[in-house]
């Protein structure tokens, strides 16, 4: 396969304008050789420190594959350590996930970063290493039985890292260095778990081109699920190492990139900290990463021996940027689908308790259900499709098939309500699942929700009606990124009286609150 280097250069030149922000880096590896390496903008606007290919940036959740690689290379068979998962979930009432299901995001556990919102955290407050395990230990139920579906969950990898350090008696930073950083030639990569002290004093920026950019104030400690800082030079060395070891079936990347599956045998889209997807017409493994002020993405197309890395110190889509580079290098033009019509509306999934909203525009559909919106267009058969998702109708119901999640949703239409009296739902509620409270206040037509729990009393969040006894709670900023977004809140009644609520977002579904 021959790269279109001219097209790749043009795509690289376009990144600073298409994905506007303080700075970024991007690189491409083909057949084990670096064919492109770019750095633009500034690592710190105020101090005028330029971004360089040697500037270390947080790669965030891309770290998950390094955790899984160190696990397999150090401990081998994960099944031998399954019993240890129970130590971290002492109150769990259902079947426990295996260590492999943690690595494959098939645990069914709720994401602990989303739960920090419900435990009363503020976006910029300090979250110490010792704060995580007590929060995880409160879990009593999950989204679904382990191994039956996919749900992104950071605490899966926190548990994995704790078991790995305990079994080896060694720090994760040393295992990374010995098993991956050293062999791969990642000379400056290291585990920098405390986000208050970023490597090379790089600054990440919240905001946008429309409102301006301001430094992100991060205070979380993360390990296993994220925490590695690496330069573009380090990441391109990693991609070259992957290519150099491609024919060794015992190499770390070959082992973590084996095709995953659910317990029923259905192929899965995520395994050992790697996402398996199709980008620019080719199969890739990779991962994204996010922290307030930073975005990262890497792709590896094994058959084409091609890798792409993009990291920003702002919040533009690194996934879209990396996809554009892959498409340019391969000369791929995405087929233009037709614009579906007559799909706009909102529905409620009775199983997850989550709202589905579909909007139409000139380019197609926007589906809002998971953490981020899905874009869909119609194929020749008229079916709206996007990456790993499609829509159909069964009468008035909306059928959403998320093949990447092993999930089919049959959602019921929800009439639109623009104005509702929050007075009858105002008050305090308690969630046994979380051992935490929710307070709703209503005044002069406005409604707000505040969460109180293990981490304090958080800021009041906006509460808006969307349907009969259905509201959304809006969380736009949180400790981790991206934030949970819109939580769906359903009112529960007995004999017409409000007795409780059910709250959930894609990362943390079906949490019941009883009125106090």
Swiss-Prot record:
This is D-aminopeptidase. Homodimer. Belongs to the peptidase S12 family. The active site is at 61 (nucleophile), 64 (proton donor/acceptor). Its EC number is 3.4.11.19. Residues 476-486 are annotated as: Important for specificity. GO terms for molecular function: aminopeptidase activity. Substrate binds at residue 480. It catalyses: Release of an N-terminal D-amino acid from a peptide, Xaa-|-Yaa-, in which Xaa is preferably D-Ala, D-Ser or D-Thr. D-amino acid amides and methyl esters also are hydrolyzed, as is glycine amide. Hydrolyzes N-terminal residues in D-amino acid-containing peptides. GO terms for biological process: proteolysis. PANTHER family: BETA-LACTAMASE-RELATED DOMAIN-CONTAINING PROTEIN (PTHR46825:SF9), D-ALANYL-D-ALANINE-CARBOXYPEPTIDASE/ENDOPEPTIDASE AMPH (PTHR46825). The keyword Zinc-finger does not apply. Inhibited by beta-lactam compounds such as 6-aminopenicillic acid, 7-aminocephalosporanic acid, benzylpenicillin and ampicillin. Inhibited by p-chloromercuribenzoate.
